[in-house]
Swiss-Prot record:
GO terms for cellular component: plasma membrane. It comes from Chlamydia muridarum (strain MoPn / Nigg). It holds the Pfam family TLC. Its main location: membrane. Belongs to the ADP/ATP translocase tlc family. This is ADP,ATP carrier protein 1. Keywords: ATP-binding, Cell membrane, Membrane, Nucleotide-binding, Transmembrane, Transmembrane helix, Transport.
Length: 529
């Protein structure tokens, strides 16, 4: 295999750009792919929320129903189809086959589906159901009433898990050597946050086009047209980069040698039952899974309440979308800052436990302030008057800050400590444990919060009525999160110490074996001399 002489990087370059010139051929298209996938993810995430929350007869209460009854089953169906296609198609054909449904649906949505929504949506049937069923089922009825918007929501959710987690990272892990991954992957993370900095203003610009439109033109329809046009252009770049990688990079022995990469252990495919069984047998893995589940549930509990406040403040879809674009931009700014200057330093200075506790403490503090403002807004008149705003707008801004701080600490600290927790484990635990957590924790994190909210909605009837109970549920889950992190830290330190002891013994044994050989060689050398 051809090797290129590589000089060590200086301190500044190793921090900012640890890439050799000849590696740009591989890094830049991968960086661009990840940037475009993340750019599309932000556009779809903000647009799906705007569509559902501001739709006629709908609101944030529809989101838990969509996530549990549509997103989770759709993800299962997709994985079954994907498994079947992976046995039939080549890797390149499979990538394009997975990308194509997204391109087709999101191209048709602004051109055909949205303009004819009045024909496609069963408004009369939904009105009949609403008259019969209790108010707690409003979210379920809204899901049926605006089923094309719900389909948009499902495809948008799948984009993140399919294109980002499965297709991109699956491709990257397959073609990237471990020595490259240590340098490349951090840059991809920066690319995702740079995508937030660009997609946020793009959403704001598209949403504010209404000011230049004439009478009789649907401003949100025009905004959708431009947003989906950006999405499709980005998809074209993704496909082009993937083609380039296969045509020019994977044929270059400097960057890709299948024989070398066969040594990488593939991730086992585990069923839900097998994953449960594996997690229950390992307290270490069970605690790690609890961290992931608790994060997913907590974010879900706060987000839906925040989005209901957001709808009351911005009932117009263009205004709602513009706010979400600004929110995405500031999420990117804060995430980049925290990742570069806070994340690694906290773990290096204060250790794993502190790094693992920052995110739940942040969610607890900011969540408490947010829920207090929502529940006791009538008692905060003095604070509201001093700030020169309204109770509703204050709740919206505090909710946005809560989301931004929670997600930025999650990206910089929670994800890092979660991955660090795998390091002291043996290879089987790393591979099987990660597979089990991906299957169980990821699904329960998303659907757990939705299940809690659905139960409370049916009983309480509305988001405002169930907010105090959501606050109690949030604090209870954070207590579980903090306890799990503390217990896992003890196991992590013990496993790390055992791993270091094992490595020290192996090193000592290797040196002991090498020393007699060195003694045998020395006389031979003296005799020759």
């Amino acid at each position: 295999m051809t090797q290129t002489a590589e000089k060590p990087f200086g301190k500044l370059r190793s921090f900012l750009w640890p890439i050799h010139m000849h590696e740009l051929k591989k890094v830049l298209p991968m960086f661009l792919m990840f940037f475009c996938i993340s750019f599309n993810y932000t556009i779809l995430r903000d647009t799906k929320d705007t569509l559902i929350v501001t739709a006629p007869g709908s609101g944030a209460e529809a989101i838990p129903f969509i996530k549990l009854w549509l997103v989770v089953p759709s993800a299962v169906v997709f994985m079954l189809i994907y498994a079947k296609l992976s046995n039939i198609l080549s890797k390149q054909a499979l990538f394009y086959a997975v990308l194509s449904p997204f391109v087709v649906f999101f191209a048709l949505f602004p051109l055909v589906i949205y303009p004819y929504r009045h024909i496609l949506h069963p408004t009369d049937f939904a009105d009949t159901l609403q008259a019969i069923l209790p108010s707690g089922f409003l979210g379920f009825i809204a899901m049926l009433r605006n089923w094309t918007f719900a389909a948009f929501y499902v495809l948008s959710e799948l984009w993140g898990s399919v294109m980002l987690s499965l297709m991109f990272w699956g491709f990257a892990n397959e073609i990237t050597k471990i020595s490259e991954a240590k340098r490349f992957y951090a840059l991809f993370g920066v690319g995702a946050n740079v995508a937030l900095l660009i997609s946020g203003p793009a959403i704001v610009w598209s949403s504010k086009l209404r000011a230049s439109l004439g009478e009789g033109v649907d401003p949100w329809g025009v905004t959708l047209y431009f947003l989906m046009a950006m999405f499709l252009c980005s998809c074209a770049i993704i496909a082009a980069c993937y083609w380039w990688m296969n045509r020019y990079v994977l044929t270059d022995p400097r960057f890709y040698n299948p024989a070398e990469l066969k040594a990488k252990k593939s991730k086992p495919k585990m069923s839900m039952g097998e994953s449960f069984s594996y997690l229950l047998r390992s307290p270490y893995m069970l605690l790690l899974a609890l961290l992931v589940i608790c994060y997913g549930v907590c974010i879900n509990l706060v987000e839906v309440t925040w989005k209901s406040q957001l709808k009351m403040q911005f009932p117009n879809p263009n205004e709602y979308s513009a706010f979400m674009g600004t929110f995405s931009f500031w999420t990117g700014v804060v995430s980049v800052f925290v990742m570069l200057f806070i994340g690694g330093n906290v773990i290096r200075r204060f250790g794993w436990l502190t790094g693992a506790l920052v995110t739940p403490v942040m969610v607890l503090v900011t969540g408490a302030i947010f829920f207090a403002l929502v529940i006791f807004r009538d008692h905060a008149t003095g604070l509201v008057a001093a700030l020169g705003t309204t109770p509703l707008m204050l709740a919206v801004v505090v909710g946005a800050v809560q989301n931004i701080l929670s997600k930025s600490t999650k990206y910089a600290l929670f994800d890092a400590t979660k991955e660090m927790a795998y390091i002291p484990l043996d290879q089987e635990q790393k591979v099987k444990g990660k597979a089990a957590i991906d299957v169980v924790a990821a699904r329960f994190g998303k659907s757990g919060g939705s299940l809690i909210q659905q139960g409370l909605l049916v009983v309480c009837g509305s988001i405002s009525a169930m907010t105090p109970f959501l606050a109690v549920a949030l604090f209870a889950i954070i207590m579980v999160w903090l306890t799990s992190a503390t217990k896992l830290n003890k196991l992590f330190l013990a496993a790390s110490a055992a791993k270091e002891q094992e490595l020290a013994e192996a090193t000592a044994a290797a040196e002991k074996e090498a020393s007699p050989a060195a003694k045998e060689v020395s006389p031979a050398i003296e005799g020759v001399s």
